Structure formats: C-alpha cells, structure tokens
A protein has these predicted regions:
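Short amphipathic alpha-helical segments
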Residues: 34, 102-103, 159-161
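Conserved P-loop
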Residues: 2-100
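Loop/turn-to-beta-strand initiation segments
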Residues: 85-88, 142-148
Length: 190
C-alpha cells in the first residue's frame, strides 16, 4: 500500500534564482527586477538613470566613452562581483548584449556580417553562441540571483493569422538562457 505524504506545503530545497523577464517597452521589466535584493543592473539601453538600482553601463565606460571590448567588460564585471555586496545581477537587455558581442566579433574579423568571409559556415554564429554560453555558466557559478531582461515583439502566423507575443531575443539564444532559468515572466501594462 502506498504511503501518502501529509497534505501541507513543503519547504523547497532551493529558491528560484534565475529569471527571464520579457515585455513591451515601459511595461515594468526593470521596475519589477529592481525589487530583488541588492541588485546591480548591467545596462545597455540608457534607461538606467530612471531606475532606483545601481548600474554599470555595458556599452559605455566610466568616462561615457564607447566600450570596444564588450566580452572583456562583461567578464571583468562578473569577476569583480564576488568582492561586492550585490546579490542580484540584472542583464538589461540581453538582445543588446548579443548584438554588441556580434558586432565585436565581426569588427575583430574585419567582416561586415557574422556569416561573411572568415566567419562563414557557422563559425561566427558559433563564436557568439559560445560567449553567451560562457556568460550563462559564469553567472550561474556565482551565489547571486540572475535576471535576464528582453523586449517583446509580436509574431504572426501567416496561415492562421494568429499573433502571439514572444521575447525579442533570437530563439537560439532564448533556448540557452531560458533553459537555464527557473522562471520566465512576461510583463504587461493593464
């Protein structure tokens, strides 16, 4: 005979720590993320001044000059996090991070597009994917909450005419990031 557990809530062994939040602009993504404990916003879209969360600009340095080594800056931030009191890292927005990494890789290769010349046959895309994988794994190794923020876009199925809201992050990168998250959240204004 099977022995049933008691009918009472259990205390989970692990709280969710990895979140993917997406929504339309100004739908409260960063605002919601700002309520996580001791948050640091790694920002790409210049709206950090509107938030109550301390931030580091990924695309501009402390002198407001453009950063050319995005990968180096990302991993410099990650390397320095254990020496701080931050308990939450917000990546705002992940599609801008992917675009900046793609630009850096194409610039370094002297190519215009990620599939041109030295980067053809999937080499360039593979390089971007590796940087994203490394970023996910490096952040998961830290004892912090990680919040990935993405914008939202509409996708319409031409055959059925049905429109659905999806993250603006390309599917192949969404699968890597959301596959390592405990929860995917969509924000919307009511």
């Amino acid at each position: 005979m099977i022995k049933f557990p008691e009918d009472k809530p259990r205390v989970p062994k692990k709280e969710p720590r990895y979140f993917f939040i997406y929504g339309k602009p100004m739908s409260g993504k960063t605002f919601f993320a700002s309520y996580f404990p001791h948050a640091l916003d790694i920002n790409t879209d210049d709206n950090a001044e509107q938030s109550r969360v301390p931030f580091v600009s990924l695309l501009k340095d402390e002198n407001n000059e453009p950063v050319s080594d995005i990968r180096g800056r990302l991993f410099e931030i990650i390397k320095g996090l254990p020496q701080t009191s931050f308990k939450t890292v917000i990546i705002d927005t992940i599609e801008d991070v992917v675009d900046a990494i793609t630009k850096q890789i194409t610039d370094e290769a002297g190519e215009k597009y990620i599939s041109d010349g030295k980067l053809s046959y999937g080499k360039g895309s593979g390089m971007v994917k590796k940087v994203i994988n490394d970023l996910v794994l490096d952040l998961k190794a830290l004892p912090v909450n990680v919040i990935w923020i993405s914008r939202e876009e509409e996708q319409t199925d031409i055959a059925s005419g049905v429109t659905k809201n999806i993250p603006a992050l390309k599917q192949k990168y969404y699968n890597i990031i959301a596959g390592n998250c405990d929860l995917v959240i969509r924000t919307q204004k009511t």
